[in-house]
Amino acid sequence: KLEPFTAFRNYHSVGKVGRIHQDVNSIENGVSYQMYRDFDSLHMQVSKEAHFMPTFEWNYDNEYLRELDRGYDFKEDLLTPGYFSMLMHPGEEIVFSAGTSELVPSQLQSLFASELKNRKKITDFESALDIAAEQFISETKKGTEITAGFHWFGRWGRDTFISLPGLTLSRKQPHVCKSVMNTMLQDLRDGLLTNVGAGEEARYNSADASLWFFWSLQKYAAHTKNTKGLWVEFGDRIKEIVESYRKGTWYNIHMTEDGLLWGGQEDVALTWMDAMV
């Protein structure tokens, strides 16, 4: 008997008892379930033929001790949509999968074995850093991105470029460094790179994200020793940023007569840690 507990919520919050959908759709060796209308369906499958019994039972007041220590809301109600029942023999292994897309159950065993094989082992402090660094790099629909922090943050412009050389160049991955820069440049607007978000959800309240991009670019150039090729690929964007800062851009960011940069707008945080100066 396998009984999954589900939350269906943003990582900034905890789930509470509410009105939910009480129907599941059968898929191969499992079910798909959409708890709320605006949420993606959760596909739950097992590697062996099983019977799923819907129950829709709430498990109240699950406590998270780390949140308690931090003074956050630490109690959550978790829903059990139902349970899987199957016959297992001594020593038999069953693989369970849960995700936003349906998988092929007959491949779950091999997928799980492949994942275990590909995982790097921590043998010393350097390998621990290498594994940790890899976890911050992800492939998205936009391209290659860096997560600013688990699990509260997504993509942040300033954090991306501050960390980029260490996460990529120090690990001999200049191609990843270049890919991240190209991904971020997709959202360049009037010389500014995003503070947070991308596309229509991008926010540009950062006076220094573009400047940190220059710093990362310098590190990339020093690592690859290909300044001519760098200028061919990034030269137009470099000039766009410099010219925008020189003439003036959003949030009153501009170059003063003495060649220094100045920026600021009431009630808009443009600097590190959302400080308003």
Where are these predicted regions, by residue range?
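Acidic, mature catalytic/reactive cores of soluble proteins
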Residues: K1-V277
